[in-house]
Structure formats: C-alpha cells, structure tokens
Amino acid sequence: IEGAPTFPGLQDPCVTILDEKVILGGVRFPVTIGEDSKAWQMEFYREGLNGGFDKVLTGPPKMKDIRFLQLLDGRILVLTRPQGERGGRGRIGFCVVDSLIQARWETIENAPLFDHCPEEQWVGANEAHLLTKNKIGVLGHLAEFKEDGSRRYRSMVFCIDLETGQSTEPEVIAERPDFPSGAPKSPDWQDVIFSGGLLRLGRGQAR
C-alpha cells in the first residue's frame, strides 16, 4: 500500500487494540545487548495521527511472544515468555496491569509462569482473546527439537482463569501436515507453523 508505514528490522508481527488504538508489535533482530550483537527485543507501536505509529514500549532483552489484551474493566493482560534461568527454553507467564506504563521490564520478567510443557519443549503465546469476563483464550505454539535437530512447531490453545490464576493444559489443534506444502525459510523449519489471525464466529466456534 503506497504511503503505508513500514517497520524495517521487525519480525514475528502481532497486533491488538488498547484504548481504541491499534498496537503493533514485533521482534527487532539483531540488536546489540552487552557483548551479544545478535540479540533480540520486542518493540510496540501505537496508532497515531495521520496513519502513523509511535513507539510506546520496548520489551525486556531477549524475550519474544509478549502479548497484550484489554480486559472489560480497562486493565491490560500481559502474556510473557521468559527463557533461561526462569523459563528454560520458553514458558508462558501472565500478569495484569492498569496501563502500558506499568508494563515495566521488572513486571514482565517476574510474572508468574504456567507449567505447560516438559523441559525439552517450549511454548509461546501468539494471540489472546476475551472469552468471558474472567476467561481468556490463548492461541499459541508448542515447539521442540526433533531427533535430526530440526524444529517442530504445533499450534495449540489453552484458557486462563483470571480469578484463580490457573490455566488449562495446552491442546494441540494443528500441525504442519494439516496445511498445503510450501517452501520453509530454512531446511530445519519444514515442520513449523506459527498460527495467528483467529476469527471468532460465535457459539464457541472460530476459524
């Protein structure tokens, strides 16, 4: 689209609406953090005037899959995905903040985590949907390394109960063979899907 804003260097885009404004997010790669010149970091841009977007938030270093969802009371659900000492290969956490200003690195990094998978696997949230006042549906991915060293990503869903802070177990809903064949970005990514754009149809149905 001629004249549309572009975001060079951003990967894995995501979108949500907060306070009636479009929020676009993505992973910037590479960025230099300390001595690591090939690190990554999420950035979020808010819809401004005349079709432009202004950067409003940068996520913690080396954390992907941060997602936001506005709740009925105006607060914001934050889905996190730390790795390393807290998260291993990748675990999903969540917290609720009053505004984006409160989504500080410390808050995001220390959000409580769900125990969704064994240590050799990892998970991440792709998008969140408000099901009822206190129930959140999450579309995400469950991933692992195969015996030949290549990656396997499957699409999964789970539900968060905001009252109890608990979640259901992830349920795999799709994998790569369910879709038409296509060229992967590299040979070790042939068995990978990264789902998004879920459209809710009502009566418990979606596509």
Predicted regions span which residues?
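Solvent-exposed, flexible loop/coil residues
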Residues: 198
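Beta-rich carbohydrate-recognition and catalytic domains
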Residues: 1-8, 17-65, 69-120, 130-188, ...
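Conserved positions at the start
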Residues: 10-13, 63-66, 123-125, 193-195
